[in-house]
Amino acid sequence: MNFLLSWVHWSLALLLYLHHAKWSQAAPMAEGGQKPHEVVKFMDVYQRSFCRPIETLVDIFQEYPDEIEFIFKPSCVPLMRCGGCCNDESLECVPTEEFNITMQIMRIKPHQSQHIGEMSFLQHNKCECRPKKDKARQENPCGPCSERRKHLFVQDPQTCKCSCKNTDSRCKARQLELNERTCRCDKPRR
């Protein structure tokens, strides 16, 4: 289904491009490869928006959050990272092939020292659109004990077993008995 949808998108995009393409003589390009005041063609925008490795400036502190005693020069580095669109909200652009790159960075310890050292960073070599991982499902793979009365239950994250927060002795101290199905202290049945 996704393949068919992608094929239809591409076909329509190509048709639109061919229908509206204007052949003009080459004019001097501005910085960034575009002519001044030129409208970027649909196919160019469409092709450049796909999930792929793209140069991204990454803050060094994002990669090395524990190195707070240093000031880095430069403070960010250009890395190839996955970016772009997947044309389906249930998919996300993720790396499928990665490698480390070593860069020389100046590490400054204010009022003490500074030196150029080597630091390793992760680069993305290949990217792919894959189903999004459900964050909530990853954090808690167990289903809820009760939709309406979650506050009455305790759940073991290892076994997913549900047990009552209330205890039988706590209920009996109030002249009630524990209903293990609802985890409430109910009036005794006669």
Swiss-Prot record:
Glycans are attached at N100. Residues 1-26 form the signal peptide. InterPro entries: Cystine-knot_cytokine, PD_growth_factor_CS, PDGF/VEGF_dom, PDGF/VEGF_growth_factor, VEGF_C, VEGF_C_sf. GO terms for cellular component: extracellular space; membrane. Disulfide bonds join C51-C93, C82-C127, C86-C129. It is found in: Secreted. GO terms for molecular function: chemoattractant activity; cytokine activity; growth factor activity; heparin binding; protein homodimerization activity; vascular endothelial growth factor receptor binding. SUPFAM superfamilies: Cystine-knot cytokines (SSF57501), Heparin-binding domain from vascular endothelial growth factor (SSF57593). CDD domains: PDGF. GO terms for biological process: cellular response to hypoxia; induction of positive chemotaxis; motor neuron migration; positive regulation of angiogenesis; positive regulation of cell division; positive regulation of endothelial cell migration; positive regulation of endothelial cell proliferation; positive regulation of focal adhesion assembly. Keywords: Angiogenesis, Developmental protein, Differentiation, Disulfide bond, Glycoprotein, Growth factor, Heparin-binding, Mitogen, Secreted, Signal. The keyword Secreted applies. PANTHER family: VASCULAR ENDOTHELIAL GROWTH FACTOR, VASCULAR ENDOTHELIAL GROWTH FACTOR A, LONG FORM. Growth factor active in angiogenesis, vasculogenesis and endothelial cell growth. Induces endothelial cell proliferation, promotes cell migration, inhibits apoptosis and induces permeabilization of blood vessels. Binds to the FLT1/VEGFR1 and KDR/VEGFR2 receptors, heparan sulfate and heparin. Binding to NRP1 receptor initiates a signaling pathway needed for motor neuron axon guidance and cell body migration, including for the caudal migration of facial motor neurons from rhombomere 4 to rhombomere 6 during embryonic development. Also binds the DEAR/FBXW7-AS1 receptor. Homodimer; disulfide-linked. Also found as heterodimer with PGF. Interacts with NRP1. Interacts with BSG. Interacts with CD82; this interaction inhibits VEGFA-mediated signaling pathway. Belongs to the PDGF/VEGF growth factor family. This is Vascular endothelial growth factor A. It comes from Bos taurus. The gene is VEGFA.
